[in-house]
Regions:
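Active-site proximal loop and beta-alpha junction motif in alpha/beta enzyme cores
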Residues: 1-130, 137-184
Length: 184
């Protein structure tokens, strides 16, 4: 089916139960993407005096993805980052940006597949449990660094699969309610 969003109409396909991803799994065609220079930005790592190199990805909204590699082993694990404080990105992006921190957990060039762990600080609201466009931006950055097109990425809200081609990106995961609010 089709779903209208601020980023345009997205095509969703129900896949049912998918091993490793859960029940009520959907695949969303997230559309075209644009990537800037790999590692063209510097990103402060909140709660430390360190920084990492980040890659700009436009998914219809701006992202800078920082892959925390072995060179940053003395810095906190992705799970331990302090994302209460907003990361600073240089050069500055006028419209602000979401910032993703990612660790590559496993990669298999023979299978064209990899696994990673990610956390995201979204512009205007801080850390969130997940971010669909952020997951896609992360997979696009990982593809640029490794040549691998298919990524299973774990965020605090769950595990999703992202498949990248030169033309577009697809996001696959379960539809899960993570919270309810009541407006007074």
């Amino acid at each position: 089916f089709r779903l209208g969003t601020r980023a345009g109409v997205k095509v969703l396909t129900s896949l049912g139960d998918v091993s490793g991803l859960g029940k009520d799994v959907f695949q969303v065609e997230m559309g075209a993407w644009k990537r800037g220079d790999v590692d063209g930005y510097e990103v402060t790592i909140p709660g430390t005096s360190g920084s990492a190199r980040g890659t700009f990805v436009d998914m219809g909204n701006p992202h800078v993805v920082a892959v925390l590699e072995d060179a940053f082993a003395s810095l906190p694990n992705v799970e331990d980052l302090d994302l209460v404080t907003k990361p600073v990105v240089a050069p500055e992006i006028p419209s602000d940006q979401n910032v993703e921190f990612v660790r590559i957990d496993e990669q298999s060039e023979g299978d064209d597949a990899g696994e990673a762990t990610m956390r995201v600080n979204e512009r205007g609201c801080g850390e969130t449990l997940s971010c669909g466009t952020g997951l896609c931006a992360t997979a696009i950055t990982l593809r640029a660094k490794t040549g691998i097109d298919h990524w299973t990425i774990t965020v605090r809200g769950g595990t999703l699969r992202v498949d990248v081609t030169d033309e577009d990106v697809k996001l696959t995961g379960s539809a899960t309610i993570v919270g309810k609010i009541e407006l007074l």
